[in-house]
Every structure is written in structure tokens, then in C-alpha cells.
Amino acid sequence: MNGLLLNVICAFTIANANPNIEKAQQTLDALYQNYTAPNTCLLRENYPFDQDNKATYLASEEQAKRRNEYSYLWPYSGTFSAVNALLESTENKKYKKLLENKVLPGLEEYFDTRREPFAYSSYISSQPLSDRFYDDNVWLGIDFTDSYRMTGKQAYLEKAKLIWKFILSGKDDVLGGGIYWCEQKKESKNTCSNAPGAVFALKLFQATQDDAYLKEGKELYEWT
């Protein structure tokens, strides 16, 4: 009981010291209240839920025309970043539990092991194959590396390394280097893949002290 009281007092003190943290907590609570898909760890794409909703940002027109019950990877992945930020800002263990019990189990619904290298696809992997975007996976890699830094959990670092292998598969010598935007449509090498890609590589270097990540990070930074 004393431990619970202490956590409540600490959370209250932090929130009052920084009103932005309180706003962030309220935003996250509202998101889960309004977007949660019943009986899952997944989220809806929009609110109120519209069964006729169609995504307009997928590379494949066939996928874009499909009606989907759950959110796509890109909006879902924002919860990973949000919970990480709150965990780092508050050091409140409830966010660590939220990460382990809701965010990551839901995220794994998007993990695609039918194609190599393994990576996260734009829609849940129990459905027909969907596009895999390098920029989406870069941000997930950053989040996994940050989670490792905060918790010391080795599994998070291993997942980040696995994602990095996928990112490297999207790099070639066309235009002198750089990472493509989408695995299925290698038509452009966008800043949204390469700038955070450099950040991801350098975070991996900080976590591992492996010079290969430092080299790749510098190359992506200079190319971008």
C-alpha cells in the first residue's frame, strides 16, 4: 500500500511540475478509450469507427481499396513512441507495463515472417501480404533501441538489430546510396527514410559500440 501511495504521489508531483506530461497522459488515455478495437491489443484507424474507411497512403492501389477493421502500422506505431516518451519522462512503471502488455503485443500482429528479411508490414500479418515501408520500420527500430536503453531488456535490442537488417536491404548504389521508401515500390529514396535512418544507426552504435553502425549512420547522414 505504501508503495502504491508513493507511486501516486510521484506521478502527481511530476504531472504538476510539467503540465505537458499531464496533457500527454490525457491524450494517451483518450486514444485508448476511443480507438481500441474490442477484445484486442489493436486500434481502429479512425474515430468514430467507419467500416467503409480506406487508406489513401499505401503504395499498392489494391491494398488502398481494401476495407480494414484495424489501424495500419504507421498510426499504431505512434503509441510505441508515446509510451516510451512517457516512460522516460515520468519513470512510472505503469508505462513499462503498458508497453509489455498492450503496445508490443499489438505491434507483433504486424510482424511479417513470410518474407525475408523479417520486418513489420503495413497491415496485420494474418491478412494478405501488405507493403513494407522502410521509414515505418526505422521509427520502430528507434523505439526498440530507446526501450532497451531505458529497461535494459536484451530482447528489445535484438529486435532493433533485426529491423536494421531489413533497413539495409533497402539500400543500394542508385543515386549514390540511400534507403528507399517502400520495399514493394523502389521508386524513390525519401528523407523520411534516410534522416531517421541515420539516427537509428547511431542509436544502435550507442547501444552496442559496434563501429559498423557508426559507419552506416555517418554515410546516411552525409547522403541525406
Where are these regions (language model features)?
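Sec-dependent signal peptide recognition
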Residues: M1-A11
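Low-complexity, Ser/Thr/Pro/Gly-enriched N-terminal "stalk/linker" regions
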Residues: A11, N16-Q127, Q154-G177
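Well-ordered alpha-helical scaffold segments within catalytic/enzyme domains
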Residues: S77-K93, W139-K153, P196-Q209
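N-terminal glycine-rich cofactor-binding segment that shapes the pocket for flavin-like pterin cofactors
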Residues: K102, F133, D146-M150
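Lumenal/extracellular "mature" regions of secretory-pathway glycan-modifying transferases
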Residues: P128-L129, L175-K186, D211
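Aromatic-lined, polymer-binding surfaces characteristic
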Residues: Y134, G141, N190-N194
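Active-site cradle of extracellular carbohydrate-active enzymes
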Residues: T191-N194, A201-F205, A212-T224
